[in-house]
Amino acid sequence: MKIGVFDSGVGGFSVLKSLLKAQLFDEIIYYGDSARVPYGTKDPTTIKQFGLEALDFFKPHQIKLLIVACNTASALALEEMQKHSKIPIVGVIEPSILAIKQQVKEKNAPILVLGTKATIQSNAYDNALKQQGYLNVSHLATSLFVPLIEESILEGELLETCMRYYFTPLKILPEVIILGCTHFPLIAQKIEGYFMEHFALSTPPLLIHSGDAIVEYLQQKYALKKNAHAFPKVEFHASGDVIWLEKQAKEWLKL
């Protein structure tokens, strides 16, 4: 089966990595809207329009399934995209919520949602978690992580300063952190390390990210078998510099 993966830039690599490892599909078309990244600072109307334009991009590729590997687009554009599509379109928020249900049984466990400004303001995660009975949910817009990751700044003083800026004011220490932006798993170890070091935690917080969650979701929803195919063929496209995108993919995905 040929599928599409859509993200604002390189963040979707975290989803793509999980898909490649699972080998659920034999061909993947990856489209990064790198000319207009980040999405997280844009207004909802603009994000919906970007989503519809991504649909137009995929039409000639004759894919059978589209994964919106962007939390902001999943929160604000997914429904509109589904209305205009004849193929199934899957976002990353629902799979993450299902992963929480499976892994977090304590409804009062403190959960922290990290995301872009647009994702957090949409309340998509907060509302979905409350519907599942989780009562102790807080959120934090950490949009500055996105341009750092797009520039391959995955460690060092600048990232440390950014984490200190966002995390120092926290009053409730989370047991669960939802990485509500597909860019964030690329710095997951740094986030975990920061909490362990600066908050003197005895055990690391549980990190939930949509890459692993979506594999499980797709297996269940579409009865797909893991490792049923040879290593998938991947084709990269971008609204910006596709050569740069391919270079980043080779570095991060070891292609």
Swiss-Prot record:
Pathway named in the protein's UniProt entry: Cell wall biogenesis; peptidoglycan biosynthesis
Top EC group: isomerase
Organism domain of life: Bacteria
Binding-site residues for substrate, renumbered to this chain: D7, S8, Y39, G40, N71, T72, T182, H183
Database matches in SUPFAM superfamilies: Aspartate/glutamate racemase (SSF53681)
Active site: C70 (proton donor/acceptor), C181 (proton donor/acceptor)
Name the record gives this protein: Glutamate racemase
Lineage: Bacteria, Pseudomonadati, Campylobacterota, Epsilonproteobacteria, Campylobacterales
